[in-house]
Amino acid sequence: MGNSIQQPSAGITLITTPELWLEGEAIKQLHTTATLPDISYAAAMPDIHPGRGYPVGAAFFTTQLIYPALIGGDIGCGMSLWQTSLKTHAMNQAKLIKQLGNLDQPLSASECTSLWPDIQPLQQHNYASGTIGGGNHFAELQMLDTIYVAEIAEQIGLNKQHLQLMVHSGSRGLGSAILDKHIRQFGHQGLIADSEAGKSYLTQHNQALAYARQNRELIARPHTDKSACTRAKTSRHQPQLYRSGLHPWRKRLAAP
């Protein structure tokens, strides 16, 4: 397969192989974005592809600036995995459909307010709470085919005898509202992390992260109750890294 780590230029790394085709526009966006002020390092994942001015599937490291436009509108987009009590040997499509019902169940306005009383922009997006969204977002039942490290599978509570429920979703309209607000105020320029604007963005960003995570819980909740699920793992896309002192934090690039 060849070397999977390539460095086409200083400060840029591609995680790929010679056999993997990458879109030229995505690589162009990667190089252009890497020249933005305060970006000291850029890394592209194997699934890199063109986005709205910035590549999707890449990570960028900064030390002083935050780029809301680079992070994108689907703040907190990620995947959570639960193991259900549904047995793999007893799979029946009709029965599963009846047991699981509708995976997209919006919450009422009062439920949203009680869950997130401090997130003001959310009041405009109550209709999206508890829903999956579009694009490549999904909720699906999965089955383990091969376990490569049994100790890790046991540690996070996964086995081949039960079905797993995976939910891929983000912050829905909330993340877009946060991004739109900052684009109207500051355009695509970077924000100094310790400035009032930077702190304001980080507060809203972290609220959207918490909302996105709990929204995946809400999507799975009806099926958690019915199937006695236990959440095994959560993974979040994390493409801009900002470091201050010894405490780095991570944020994602753009909605898929």
Predicted stretch roles:
Residues I71:
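Active/ligand-binding-proximal structured segments within catalytic/core domains
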Residues D104, S110-P117:
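Long, basic N-terminal domains or extensions that often function
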Residues W82:
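Iron-sulfur (Fe-S) cluster-binding segments and ferredoxin-like electron-carrier domains
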Residues G2-Q29, P37-A43, P50-V56, Q64-P68, ...:
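Domain-length cofactor-binding catalytic modules of enzymes
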Residues A34:
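Glycine-rich loop/turn
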